Amino acid sequence: MTTIDLNCDLGESFGAYKMGNDDEILPFVSSINVACGFHAGDPAVMRQTVEKALQHNVAIGAHPGFPDLIGFGRRNMSVSASEVYDYVLYQIGALDGFVKAAGGKMQHVKPHGALYNMAVTDSEIADAIAKAIYHINPGLLLYGLANSEAFIKATEKYNITLVQEAFADRTYKQDGTLTSRTEENALIKNEDEAIKQVLQMVKEGYVESVNGGKVAVQAQTICLHGDGEKAVQFAEKIYRTFKLNGISICAPNK
C-alpha cells in the first residue's frame, strides 16, 4: 500500500488575531508545522497548538520563519547564513520547550515562506538550516521541497533525514520549483484540479508544470494550506480521496 504524510501549517494566530482553521483541519492531517513566533504565532498559541496536536495523535514540527510579522514571513530578507542559523535554532528551541512540557516529542522542522523558498536554491541558507537542526537534535527530520539539490546536499552533509515535500495547491515551474506567489497562476484554486495533481504526484511520481511539461516528483509528504476559505473542505476531500484510492496517511516517524 502507498503511504503518504499530509502536513499543514498551523498555530498562526497572534494575540487577538485569529488565523486558520486549526481545530477543523487536525482530524485530516498526520503532521503539523507550528509557527514559532517570528512570522506568526505567540507563546500561548504555540502551547495550545501543541496540546491539540497531541490529543489528535498528530506529529509536531517547528515552522521557523524570518522575523517578519507584517509580511507573514513571505518576503525575502538579505541575511547571512549565521543569522539564518540563529533564527532557526532559536525557534526550534522555543517550540521544543512546549512539546516537552506537554509530554510529547518533536518530529520535524519545516522552514516557512521566504526562508523555505530561498533555501530551495541557496545552498548556504539550506546548510544553515540543516546545521541548526543537527546541533539541537540530529534526529529531527527536515521537510523540504522535493528535488531541491540544496536541501539534499545539506541533509547529507549533516546526516539528517530529508522528507521530500510536494504541494497540493501550488503550481510548479519546469525546473521543479514552485511558481512565485507574485504570479497569478501560483495557486490552484479549483479543488478537483488540485486533487488530480496530488494523485499524479503520489501514484505516478510526476507533476505537470505551468509550461505543460512533466516534472518528476517523489513526494513523501504533501502540504495542505489551512488558512483558505475552503481549507477544511479541501483537506477532508483529499483525505477521503486518498482513502478511496488505497493510499495510507501516516507521519514519517509513526
Swiss-Prot record:
Protein name in the entry: 5-oxoprolinase subunit A
Pfam families per the UniProt record, alphabetical: LamB_YcsF
Protein's gene: pxpA
Top-level enzyme category: hydrolase
GO molecular function: 5-oxoprolinase (ATP-hydrolyzing) activity; ATP binding
InterPro entries: Glyco_hydro/deAcase_b/a-brl, LamB/YcsF/PxpA-like
Quaternary structure and interacting proteins, as annotated: Forms a complex composed of PxpA, PxpB and PxpC.
Keywords for this protein: ATP-binding, Hydrolase, Nucleotide-binding
Domain of life: Bacteria
Role played: Catalyzes the cleavage of 5-oxoproline to form L-glutamate coupled to the hydrolysis of ATP to ADP and inorganic phosphate.
Family: Belongs to the LamB/PxpA family.
EC number: 3.5.2.9
A GO BP annotation: carbohydrate metabolic process
Catalytically driven reaction(s): 5-oxo-L-proline + ATP + 2 H2O = L-glutamate + ADP + phosphate + H(+)
